[in-house]
Amino acid sequence: MSQDFLQTILKQKEAEVAQLVNEPVESVRSTYSLFDFLTKQKDQLQLITEVKKASPSMGDINLTLDITEQARQYEAAGAAMISVLTDQIFFKGDVQFLRQISDLVSIPTLAKDFIIDEKQIIRSLNAGATVILLIVAALSEDRLKELFKFATRLGLEVLVETHNLSELDIAHRIGAKIIGVNNRNLTTFEVSLQTSLDLAPHFLPDRVYVSESGIFTNEQAELLAPYFHALLVGTALMQSEDVAQKVKELSIEKG
């Protein structure tokens, strides 16, 4: 994996944005607030389940998957939200996957992409997303704040992704209410759950926190449960032969 993966993907995103048209803004799909839902679920660790056919770190994960059936299983198993990869080049996703899944389920859906422009946000909303991802490492603080405010004004919720303390401070500073801690370093692609554990002492009481990446086992979920409201899990579920059982295994009671 290239040491400058993030910069490589951001250059690709700039090229994609240049080709995007200005879509008229539609209404946000009706569902519950992810923030409100996670705030109320104090006794159980929730799961954000991901539809991800491939990734730069793992290669092809499950290319033949029926994404709508996978989404149906996620919702039936009690997922808090479904994350859908919309990046085509690096993750073999598609905005049409987001549209298909959002049309099918009643729970929130997350547009999982490297968002750098308002046009991407509008496209995600129009495809049925109720939550978008903004990555602190991908944007200047000023630009992050602009896109955060833009999405919020449209009625979307925003998952702001961090990886270290300085990024967490930025997420807090811009007023993010749903904050992700990515255990994967987007420069080197190395994964460590210690990232989540190290940042947990700096969490604020009026926000919700999601641990992302590298989560495969009940033991790992138990380790993270005291500090996080939810886990974002993709590869473990995409490779599982029993999705419902895997969701149950990771959606543990919080002691």
Language-model features: locations:
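Glycine-rich phosphate-binding active-site loops on the catalytic face of alpha/beta enzymes
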Residues: 126-143, 180-188, 228-247
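Conserved, mostly hydrophobic/aromatic
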Residues: 9, 49, 74, 82, ...
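An N-cap/entry alpha-helix motif that binds or orients negatively charged groups
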Residues: 1-62
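C-terminal helical cap(s) of enzyme catalytic domains, especially alpha/beta-barrels
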Residues: 196-203, 239-255
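Catalytic cores of alpha/beta
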Residues: 116-128, 164-174, 211-233, 247
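Active-site beta-loop-alpha junctions enriched in small/polar residues
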Residues: 12, 50-54, 87, 114, ...
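N-terminal active-site wall of soluble small-molecule enzyme domains
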Residues: 46, 59-108, 112-159, 165-170, ...
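Catalytic-face loop-and-helix region of soluble metabolic enzyme cores
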Residues: 178-187, 192-225
